[in-house]
Amino acid sequence: MPKFSEQPQSEVRQRLLDGMIRYMKLAGNDCGYKKADVAQCMKIIDGYLAALGEGKSSKLSEPKIREAVKKAVLDLNRLNEKCGGSLIETDQREYLCQLLLVAARRAGLKTRDDITEAWREW
């Protein structure tokens, strides 16, 4: 399991967004996804962070956290598949895993394992 820094989630989210937009501009029509797909990715992430109560002090049960992770990963799988697998590349995968796993730990998940691997197709 890679060690992720405890930098603010907003910074990691912004790097993810910037990387997707930068590649889209560089590759043009050949990138495989559109601004709407990037917006949908951010919506999935924001919904996930909200479901975990990001920024709140209360902790969730481990089953609730795992269910939120599973939903976000499956939603991202579907979106990436819709984009022909081009939306989530290596850099994006690392940022997404960091966002998902750090938020899960902050919400109360005890494991240091990468629980996204059970469902992740990217």
Give the ranges of each region predicted by the language model.
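Short terminal alpha-helical segments
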Residues: 1-54
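Arginine residue identity/basic-tract feature
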Residues: 13-15, 22, 66, 78, ...
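Amphipathic alpha-helical binding modules
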Residues: 3-6, 83-122
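Generic alpha-helix signal with a bias toward terminal, lower-confidence helices
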Residues: 16, 28, 56-57, 77, ...
